[in-house]
Amino acid sequence: MNKIFRKFENKEYKLKPNDIIYTPKPVAEIMIKMCNIQPNDTVLDPSKGGGVFFDNLPECDKSYCEITENIDFFDASGKYDLIIGNPPYSLWNKWLDKTMELTDKFCYIFGIMNFTHARMARILDKGYVMTHYHLLKISYWFSHSVIVIFEKKPINTYMTKFSVSAETCYCDICGKDCGRGSKGNSYNKCYAK
């Protein structure tokens, strides 16, 4: 996977000022494929960027799409089937709260340094579970990043029995054993069955 991203290390994807990190096209393609977007889904990409998610959506009638500029994500309303993007890390907590108000499913890129116990607890406490993740290493970004999909799901017997925790999910994503069993066990605890 790293070989693919080395091809895209050029000026187009370098870090930009004002908390804007442009998402490379191959990363957007992976995210879109992971989300399994259906033809009638309403999808929101609230991040400021070059439109890489919009441009790579699966076949859809883009005449029904709306691109708005100078609109604040925090003023958005309604419900969406999916929110996808690479949000500004400086606004993570506020961004997550607004996201969870607007959707039951979201797919974001988290920098590992932003994937904290507190943020995981904030997400899990609202009834979301991690359904997919994909670890990325893009050398010109700050550190490792992870694509994560969270979905609001009813608590089921499996999750209740094993008690999903923010610590379990966080440690597994970082590739560490939390001391609660093998990494394999931690990995399974993060998934809805």
Language-model-detected regions and their locations in the chain:
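Class I S-adenosyl-L-methionine-dependent methyltransferase catalytic core
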Residues: 1-193
